[in-house]
Amino acid sequence: MQLTPHEQERLLIHVAADVAEKRRARGLKLNHPEAVALITSHILEGARDGRTVAELMSSGRKLLTRDDVMEGIPEMIHDVQVEATFPDGTKLVTVHDPIV
């Protein structure tokens, strides 16, 4: 399988998000990379599904709570920015303060 660097990066994000989701399902608190991967994957998949930027900005803030992540992680993640491909082109999605 021949993947471009961009495709490799997206695949790595989805694998990391899958690991994070499995850990969360087992009751483990997520670390910084796991939390960011989960939010990023949510945005990428939502864009692929045809959701709007506004919908993804809103739902990205509801994905994780302080109870889902290790102590101090919410303060470390101020914004998550993802360049996602929507049906009408590529757009930058920014989720401000994604963990409340």
Swiss-Prot record:
GO terms for cellular component: cytoplasm. One of its GO terms (molecular function) is nickel cation binding. It is found in: Cytoplasm. The keyword Cytoplasm applies. Its EC number is 3.5.1.5. Gene3D superfamilies: Urease, gamma-like subunit. GO terms for biological process: urea catabolic process. It catalyses: urea + 2 H2O + H(+) = hydrogencarbonate + 2 NH4(+). Its main location: cytoplasm. It is an enzyme of class 3 (hydrolase). Keywords: Cytoplasm, Hydrolase. It comes from the Bacteria. The keyword Hydrolase applies. Heterotrimer of UreA (gamma), UreB (beta) and UreC (alpha) subunits. Three heterotrimers associate to form the active enzyme. Belongs to the urease gamma subunit family. HAMAP family: Urease_gamma. This is Urease subunit gamma. It comes from Streptomyces avermitilis (strain ATCC 31267 / DSM 46492 / JCM 5070 / NBRC 14893 / NCIMB 12804 / NRRL 8165 / MA-4680).
